[in-house]
């Protein structure tokens, strides 16, 4: 067996033993959960390993606990906090919480259940040792708290929240559980989570991290993926710069990158399908589509107010209605050997003089065909590559 001995500094005679469960004997990082520590105390941890031959004890590591709060009963968080309700900026909580406790936590974060402001300033919360119980309303949507679930609206509108570690036994994160948490940068997801839906309005969110022990999800570069790594579950809106889709991806779902902050996308030839509105209202400036994509779906780049350059894949066959509506394209590159079919409103655009300001780039020898086309011929400037 392996684990560590835990004791208060200066009191090694009172040490307790914490054992790693289901230890397989392999080398590498090992995670060990240690509970029931005193607040604001000085501890030492001594790693050990034991077999039939004997025991090896490593050098002690010192650790200072913080002002963690432990609940013995549901509904008592408000009482425990007392006059200190609005003083915390960082907090760890242990115990069982219901809707009443979560509502108190919202107050500490600066919002009540009607989204009215409070003096709270809590921004960093660790709920690892929390068990979520059913009962009691929480959040501006007034949903009832549920067992092991972060229900819709639980933290909605908590603009001061920057970082949250979810309960170790939480199984569900409902849609918009963190809606409009505009300062939230990171969410840590436990191994137990099996159902996750994204939240809108998390404009600063840069990373969703997942326990390596989670069998349903994984995180890559801060992006939440399914376990197979070929589908985006939640793309953080605050992630910036360039993004190259992992080669395992074969499709991008509807609205997958809606409102995201990535400025340049590169899609491999493995991507075969794009969902409707996949990049709608995003901050994208440039995108390179791979040869695997044949259909440009409805509204895929609608509302992309910074999008100026689009490179269509070599096998593009069809462009659907309103694909670029509201996008101020300056250059559209078409490399297909056959002229793609366009629906009647494929290039309908709120941008004034779209056909005059966007340069259409076509393969060598095909300029005349595009100029004589009913829809493609509307472009004032057509150049051969």
Where are these regions (language model features)?
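Short, surface-exposed linear motifs at loops/turns and structural transition points
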Residues: 1-66
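Helix-loop-beta element that forms the nucleotide-linked donor phosphate-binding surface
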Residues: 373-378
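Structural signature of tandem-repeat unit edges
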Residues: 67-72, 89-97, 114-149, 158-172, ...
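A short acidic, amphipathic alpha-helical/loop segment
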Residues: 80, 101-108, 345-346
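Acidic Gly/Asp/Thr-rich repetitive segments characteristic of extracellular carbohydrate-active
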Residues: 68-88, 106
């Amino acid at each position: 067996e392996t684990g560590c001995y835990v004791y208060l500094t200066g009191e090694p005679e009172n040490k307790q033993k914490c054992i790693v469960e289901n230890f397989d004997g392999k080398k590498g990082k090992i995670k060990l959960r240690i509970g029931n520590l005193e607040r604001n105390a000085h501890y030492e941890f001594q790693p050990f390993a034991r077999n039939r031959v004997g025991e090896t004890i490593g050098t002690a590591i010192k650790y200072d606990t913080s002002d963690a709060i432990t609940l013995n009963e549901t509904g008592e968080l408000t009482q425990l906090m007392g006059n200190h309700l609005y003083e915390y900026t960082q907090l760890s909580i242990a115990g069982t919480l219901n809707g009443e406790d979560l509502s108190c936590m919202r107050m500490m974060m600066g919002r009540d259940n009607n989204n009215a402001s409070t003096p709270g300033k809590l921004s960093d919360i660790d709920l690892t040792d929390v068990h979520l119980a059913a009962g009691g309303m929480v959040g501006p949507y007034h949903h009832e708290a549920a067992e092991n679930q972060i229900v819709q609206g639980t933290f909605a509108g908590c603009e001061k929240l920057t970082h949250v570690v979810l309960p170790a036994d939480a199984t569900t994160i409902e849609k918009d559980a963190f809606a409009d948490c505009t300062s939230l940068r990171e969410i840590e997801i436990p191994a137990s989570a099996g159902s996750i839906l994204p939240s809108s309005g998390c404009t600063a969110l840069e990373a969703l991290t997942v326990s390596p022990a989670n069998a349903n999800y994984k995180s890559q570069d801060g992006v939440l993926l399914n376990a197979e790594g070929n589908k985006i579950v939640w793309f953080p809106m605050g992630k910036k710069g360039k993004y190259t889709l992992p080669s395992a991806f074969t499709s991008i779902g509807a609205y997958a990158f809606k409102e995201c902050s990535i400025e340049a996308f590169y899609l491999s030839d493995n991507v075969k399908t794009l969902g409707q509105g996949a990049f709608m209202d995003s901050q994208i400036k440039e995108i390179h589509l791979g040869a695997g994509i044949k259909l440009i779906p409805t509204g895929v780049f609608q509302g992309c107010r910074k999008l100026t350059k689009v490179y269509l894949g070599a096998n593009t066959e069809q462009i659907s209605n309103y694909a670029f509506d509201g996008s101020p394209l300056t250059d559209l590159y078409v490399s297909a050997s056959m002229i793609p079919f366009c629906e009647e409103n494929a290039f309908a655009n709120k941008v004034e003089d779209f056909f005059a300001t966007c340069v259409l780039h076509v393969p060598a020898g095909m300029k005349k065909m595009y100029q004589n086309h009913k829809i493609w011929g509307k472009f004032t400037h057509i150049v051969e590559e």
